[in-house]
Amino acid sequence: MKSILFSLTLVFTALACFAQDYYGNNRKQWLQKAEQYKPKLIITEKKPLKVVDIVPDTQSFQKYKAVDVSPIDSLYSMPFRLKKEITIDFGEHLTGYFSFSVRSTGLAADGPLRFKLTFGEVPSEVAVPFDSYKEGLSRAWLQDEVVSVMYVPQTVTLSRRLAFRYVKIELLGSSPYYDFNIHDMKCMAQTSAKNIPEELPQAVDPMIRKIDRVGLNTLKECMQTVYEDGPKRDQRLWIGDLYLEALGNNYSYKQHDLTKRCLYLLAGLSDLNGYLLATVIENPVPRAQDKQFLYEYALLYNVTLKDYLEATGDMETVKDLWPVAKKQLDIVRTNVKADGLMDFEKVKKDWWVFFDWKEDLYKEAPLQGVSIFALKESYKLAQLLGKEKEVADLPALTNKMIKAARKNLYNRKTGLFVGTGDKQISYASQIWMILSGVASKAEGKKALSALDTTQNVCYPGTPYM
């Protein structure tokens, strides 16, 4: 009997050790700090400017454009029942909650109304029906809603947050015995971005100034209570988007508490083994998406932490999160081969290797590049913290991996970087070899120039790349 109990004790002890949390009690206080730095949303009432028609136009983006019809006030005084359908334009992209009011014009309302509302960021979204959508992601992400108004007059506020500029309103059902107006349409727009970034100097090319304004507005819309990868879809925090958005914030809005919140959230919701999960879903309560291990995102956390320290000088926070950054380095250490090349096949089995939404992208060279980049940036972080001794192996490992990349991945004749298993020439390979410093400035310039004259180049699939 004693031997059985002893055996059971060993089993349970082993299980407990197996399930042990790498960060222990730190997790709780990290999540508390994440909540502490949750920003207050700034709510601004925005009203539509005009009624528009969406018409086909081969010269416009996605083949549709908006044509002005009348000021918005004309809609508010017009009986709507015979109109049936109308599109309004807010004049700018907004993220927030839409509402409208209805009132009868004359006879008392004797029945309910039903509307279909379609929201679009660009004209084509409200022009092309969603019926042909083949579900890959949830159909519910598409921004259309059927609304029944049981009593008139009434004000209706949609419960879902929307990201849009245009709204198409279609009347699906009404009583033939009374007419009504739609009026007082508005969006309670929200963002946590409260500071006003400096504009580029007037001497800068006007097109660059326009691009900068659009980029800043896009960042503002993504700055909610985390850096969202997109305010329309999928309204969550991804480490890769955090890296880019926080970097932009460092030079524009400079609201570093949002970055701090995201860094703490990701740390607090990391896997029990200490590795970061790529994405956090914030509502109804923050939670990480289980088993979502994304190779380069885990490493980019370290870079974001280093950038945050350089922007803020907040040693306390960064020292608090240093154990997380240090743990992510094991991802490289355990996957680099004796010759200094990353074990691409092994990494693919154990991790999601992303880089871009591009199915035919061969990722061996980008993997080598981002690994070197992350090691370099992590060592800089260690130097800023006075923690070099804790990662004393990094300089030698980095140099070994750089030499391996130049020996095995660089074609001196063409000036381009390619993989060992596939000779595909891609923008991703050149970009990550340049960012990592494997390529010199002259070599980087040559590689990017060569892409313009090389056939069968694998181009970026998305703006993220």
Model feature map: region roles:
Residues 17, 122-124, 314, 441:
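Alpha-helix N-cap recognition
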Residues 20-229, 241, 278-282:
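Extracellular/oxidizing-compartment recognition motifs
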Residues 8, 12, 124, 155, ...:
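A broad, structure-centric signal for solvent-exposed, well-ordered loop/edge residues
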Residues 238-253, 257-465:
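Active-site core of glycosidic bond-cleaving carbohydrate-active enzymes
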Residues 1-21:
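Bacterial Sec-dependent N-terminal signal peptides
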Residues 14-16, 218, 252, 269:
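Generic N-terminal helix/loop capping motif
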